[in-house]
Amino acid sequence: MTDTAENQTQNNWQAGHPRSIRSFVLRQSHMTAAQQRAIDTLWDSFGIDYQATPADLDARFGSSRPKILEIGFGMGTATAEIARRLPETDFLAIDVHGPGVGNLLKLIDENHLENIRVMRHDAVEVVENMLQDGSLDGIHIFFPDPWHKKRHHKRRLIQAPFIAKLLPKLKTGGYIHLATDWEEYAQQMLEVLSSFDSLQNTAADYAPTPDYRPETKFEARGKRLGHGVWDLVFKRIG
């Protein structure tokens, strides 16, 4: 998949969904030569193209290991590190931004990781159309855009309608792990997840950061500036 072809796919999606409220903005970002080369040479091995019908994740990974969905991986550094720490778990990583996709593919190659597959598409459509019910053991959404202006809150990804779409895809006993450095968004996340009877908080409110989640450079810089970070881990109980 070339970056040009994927841009056309995204343009077609926008044309077909003019009234959709999306949680992301498609930025014009510079793709380095190394990132583009990674897409050109590694996509066939580690990329998954969007389809509007359910996909067999075990077949796509070539394994029956537990499956984790990661939505919004940025430049992919944390995703690659989590996959390295959890080699017996498969990760389906979704983002819309080309440089991040290229960088994650590059990291997969450099670290000899076999347990990541990458998609460049709107995660909401993937959840709605590609993921089979009960196919996921966990869901990671780390540092989604907080859309801090009140008039933009409707763009936030973590809202009840989206969680309602995710829940059927999650096995009983599976978990949802969210993280944010925006306190007001953390409160909203807590309220949204707590509103579902089929989800149980694993902590009294916010959870300690699990060992598998590395600290990102952005997160470390925020902590130096006195910013907090909030993790939430909820388990599906029914």
Swiss-Prot record:
UniProt keyword terms in alphabetical order: Methyltransferase, S-adenosyl-L-methionine, Transferase, tRNA processing
Xref: CDD domains: AdoMet_MTases
Positions of substrate binding: 149, 181, 216-219
Protein's pathway: tRNA modification; N(7)-methylguanine-tRNA biosynthesis
GO molecular-function terms, A-Z: tRNA (guanine(46)-N7)-methyltransferase activity
Record-level GO BP terms: RNA (guanine-N7)-methylation; tRNA methylation
Catalysed reactions, semicolon-separated: guanosine(46) in tRNA + S-adenosyl-L-methionine = N(7)-methylguanosine(46) in tRNA + S-adenosyl-L-homocysteine
Keyword RNA-binding: no
EC number(s) stated in the UniProt entry for this protein: 2.1.1.33
GO cellular component: tRNA methyltransferase complex
InterPro entries on file: SAM-dependent_MTases_sf, tRNA_(Gua-N-7)_MeTrfase_Trmb, tRNA_methyltr_TrmB_bact
Binding site for S-adenosyl-L-methionine: 70, 95, 122, 145
Domain of life: Bacteria
Active-site residues per Swiss-Prot or TrEMBL entry: 145
SUPFAM superfamilies assigned: S-adenosyl-L-methionine-dependent methyltransferases
Pfam family, one: Methyltransf_4
Claim: Transcription is one of the keywords in the record: no
Family membership: Belongs to the class I-like SAM-binding methyltransferase superfamily. TrmB family.
HAMAP family: tRNA_methyltr_TrmB
NCBIfam families in the cross-refs: tRNA (guanosine(46)-N7)-methyltransferase TrmB
Described purpose of this protein according to its UniProt entry: Catalyzes the formation of N(7)-methylguanine at position 46 (m7G46) in tRNA.
Protein name, UniProt field: tRNA (guanine-N(7)-)-methyltransferase
Gene name of the encoded protein: trmB
